[in-house]
């Protein structure tokens, strides 16, 4: 037993519950201009606006891409959807000031609703990477709002945005070909999760880290960049995916995704799937996979152990387990099962892997497997090389265990 204890190198990695800082989530404060009543009557209507004819004669373009999910749009009431479509078009075409329809005003909307609707447009459209916020002008007659002008704020010119959009399309087209459009929805989600983690470094100082440019053009980002890139790729692969905003239990702002696989909803957190990002000291461990699958297609119950869902769009209750990574890959345990565990180690060996991860259904199962494999060191019965050093990591909140062989 003493010899065995010497070669059993246990590394308990502290799971860092960190997310993006609160300043990393897009939150723009608009400007409000209320004109006095005497100026209202002299303002041109949409029909009289002299810029309307110029706009019609100018060749239009749009950076909006087809095929994406409109999950946030579908959460809105009918009057809100009217403004959504107008703001969506304005941002997609990088227009200047546009007049919002007055019908929603008659139905009870006001300038305070613009922020929610703007956020919904941004949630649904990761390809609007060049917009940083908006301003609006409110026209009032007495206490009544009679008109609102909306203008997007952009950090790029039209020409710059078009060039970047084309660069992103070319790069992601190669990624999509590599993934394969004929795969199942689960396989697409898993492949995107892995591709983004392999191709991206977590870097708080990465340029454009609030949008997809950081991932696809720079290879470095933070949580919102990871999440929007995940959404962009899955939308192009025909998988419903939307952005989720909230916090982690340290209180820091964070962003991740909601996906639909075979008709059921699941949460996916690509940022937290980056194992190196989750390390306490940011260092890599020999033999440990770069990918942590604890956050690939998880339930609401699972995600709420570490995340808090906020934002303007209500999320569905996710209860399905069929597309959970551990269930799908056969690494989900309801009790200690020697035959199942042996199959997992044998399969890993055949693929040339030196690590395995398993997930437990509940605390009872988790404690039992920890006792047998770690306390009683039964883990060595699955490793043929008696000279191996085995390291392990525990995620008590997600009830998962990772074991890997090192040469130390």
Where are these regions (language model features)?
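Short, well-ordered strand-loop elements centered on a beta-strand within folded domains, enriched
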Residues: 146-150, 214, 218, 264-270
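Hydrophobic/aromatic-rich core segments of domains that either
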Residues: 225-298
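A short, highly charged nucleic-acid-interacting micro-segment common to nuclease
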Residues: 212-226
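Sec-dependent N-terminal signal peptides of Gram-positive bacterial secreted proteins and lipoproteins
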Residues: 2-25
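Secondary-structure boundary elements
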Residues: 160-215
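Alpha-helix capping and helix-loop boundary segments enriched in small/acidic/polar residues
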Residues: 85-87, 159, 217-221, 245
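N-terminal accessory/pre-domain segments preceding catalytic cores
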Residues: 19-182, 299-408
């Amino acid at each position: 037993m003493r010899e065995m204890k010497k070669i059993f190198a246990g590394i308990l990695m502290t799971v860092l519950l960190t997310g993006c800082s609160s300043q990393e989530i897009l939150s723009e404060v608009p400007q409000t201009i209320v004109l006095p009543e005497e100026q209202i009557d002299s303002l041109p209507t949409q029909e009289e606006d002299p810029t309307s004819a110029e706009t019609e004669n100018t060749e239009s373009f749009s950076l909006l891409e087809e095929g994406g999910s409109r999950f946030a749009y579908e959460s809105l009431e009918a009057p809100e959807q009217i403004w959504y479509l107008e703001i969506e078009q304005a941002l997609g075409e990088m227009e200047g000031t546009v007049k919002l329809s007055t019908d929603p005003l008659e139905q009870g909307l006001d300038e305070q609703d613009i922020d929610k609707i703007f956020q919904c447009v941004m949630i649904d459209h990761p390809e609007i990477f060049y917009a940083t916020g908006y301003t609006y002008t409110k026209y009032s007659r007495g206490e009544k709002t009679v008109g609102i002008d909306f203008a997007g704020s952009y950090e790029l010119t039209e020409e710059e945005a078009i060039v970047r959009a084309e660069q992103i399309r070319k790069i992601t087209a190669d990624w999509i070909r590599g993934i394969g459009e004929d795969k199942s929805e689960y396989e697409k989600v898993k492949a995107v999760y892995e591709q983004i983690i392999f191709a991206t470094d977590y870097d708080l100082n990465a340029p454009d880290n609030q949008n997809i440019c950081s991932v696809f053009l720079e290879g470095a980002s933070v949580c919102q960049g990871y999440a929007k890139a995940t959404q962009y790729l899955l939308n192009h692969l025909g998988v419903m995916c939307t952005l989720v905003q909230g916090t982690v239990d340290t209180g820091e702002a964070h962003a991740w995704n909601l996906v639909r696989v075979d008709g059921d909803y699941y949460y996916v957190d690509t940022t937290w799937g980056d194992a190196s990002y989750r390390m306490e000291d940011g260092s890599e461990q020999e033999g440990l996979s770069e990918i942590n699958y604890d956050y690939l297609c998880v339930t609401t119950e699972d995600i709420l152990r570490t995340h808090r869902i906020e934002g303007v769009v209500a999320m569905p209750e996710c209860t399905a387990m069929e597309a959970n990574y551990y269930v799908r890959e056969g690494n989900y345990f309801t009790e200690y099962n020697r035959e199942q565990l042996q199959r997992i180690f044998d399969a890993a060996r055949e693929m040339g892997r030196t690590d395995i991860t398993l997930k437990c259904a509940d605390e009872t199962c988790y404690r039992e497997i920890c006792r047998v494999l770690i306390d009683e060191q039964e883990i060595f019965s699955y490793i043929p090389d008696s000279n191996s050093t085995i390291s392990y990591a525990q995620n008590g909140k997600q009830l998962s265990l990772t074991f890997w062989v090192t040469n130390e």
